[in-house]
Each structure stands twice: as structure tokens, then as C-alpha cells.
Amino acid sequence: MPKLILCRHGQSEWNAKNLFTGWEDVNLSEQGINEATRAGEKVRENNIDIDVAFTSLLTRALDTTHYILTESKQQWIPVYKSWRLNERHYGGLQGLNKDDARKEFGEEQVHIWRRSYDVKPPAETEEQREAYLADRRYNHLDKRMMPYSESLKDTLVRVIPFWTDHISQYLLDGQTVLVSAHGNSIRALIKYLEDVSDEDIINYEIKTGAPLVYELTDDLEVIDKYYL
């Protein structure tokens, strides 16, 4: 039976500081390391044999993957990384304190940017964009693929092709797959898997460092889901 494990990275240093993070590359906090370690322990305690793992290009997700596989004694399995699993790009909000953003733009506007399905935050500057384009992780990408900012809908548009072309292929082969990613890239996968409405998906809360297991049919229909 195919099994999918979705796990948002452990708390990051910027999560702890209440900052918009998006594509900014920050480390796990001490709490985040503990969460990721505990996630791996839960995988081991539940005797789950992972066949393959997928993660983003951002350190907090990469490190979470490492801790999960290390603590579950499965460091040797293949791990595939893609920018398509990165967090939603928060554009010009990245690096801002969320409370300060509410004071500057108004609480209602910030809520719309954070929780609407198809509204993008303000775009990043050209200088910020050029820094991403120069990053070795992204400098091979067509510039047209690099976002200035993203809505949740935009995030889904880039995540689902990766699901279809890569992740789902291992599940269709009956394997157990770990996806260690981010709040919004995981929301995109949940929306697709469960056919969640645009209105409802924005209210889904994704816990940090908590493995969410999906048991699937051979056709990848959801049979059951539960947190470890």
C-alpha cells in the first residue's frame, strides 16, 4: 500500500522571531531541531520504512529531512531536492516582522496577503530578485520561472507538476515517500490530494515538525490520514 508522509520543517529561527520567511534561507531554531529529531523518532517508533524522500532547496527543510532520516536510522535512502517544493515566495514581505507589517499595511491587508488563495504580497525589488538569480541553487532556472512573489495558488501551480512527474511515480509503485517541505508547499499538496476548496485550504494549519501520514489506494486515493 502506498504511503505518503508530509512533514513541515521544524521551527526556524525566523519563525521564532515572527518574521516572514518565504525563500529566505534560515536555520532551524533549537526548538526546530528538537521537533525534527522527535519526528524521526516517531517514524522509527511506528516502524515506518521510508523508500525515498523529497525536500526543497532551503536549509530548514533539508536539515529536517536529515534529522528525520538520521533518527529513524534511514540516512541511506535516496533524497531528491527541488526548488518546486520551496516555501511560498512572500516577495517584499520577506524579512519583515509580521506585527510591524500589520502596523505598516493594516491588519486586514496583511491577513489577505497571508490567507487568501490567489492574492500575492507586494513584489520583491529587482535587487532582491537578482540576488536569487545569482544563487547557485537557482541560476540554472529560466528567469521567467522565478517569482517576484506568490499566492498560494501560484505555489500550487509549481508544486503539482513535481508531484505528478516525480513524487507520485514512487507512490504508484507502492513505495513509502517522505516529503519534508514548508507550510504552503504542503498546503498545495493537501489541496490536490484531498480536493480541498480554495476557501477551505487557506485555513489549514500545518504543524511544524509533525509527520502527517496518508495511506493511499493504488490509484492514490486517500484511505486514511493521521499525525504520528
UniProtKB/Swiss-Prot annotation:
Reaction catalysis annotation: (2R)-2-phosphoglycerate = (2R)-3-phosphoglycerate
CDD domains reported in the protein's UniProt record: HP_PGM_like
UniProt keyword Transport, yes or no: no
EC assignment: 5.4.2.11
Pfam families: His_Phos_1
Biological or metabolic pathway of the protein: Carbohydrate degradation; glycolysis; pyruvate from D-glyceraldehyde 3-phosphate: step 3/5
Residues that bind substrate: 8-15, 21-22, 60, 87-90, 98, 114-115, 183-184
Function, as annotated: Catalyzes the interconversion of 2-phosphoglycerate and 3-phosphoglycerate.
Protein name: 2,3-bisphosphoglycerate-dependent phosphoglycerate mutase
Species this protein is from: Staphylococcus aureus (strain MRSA252)
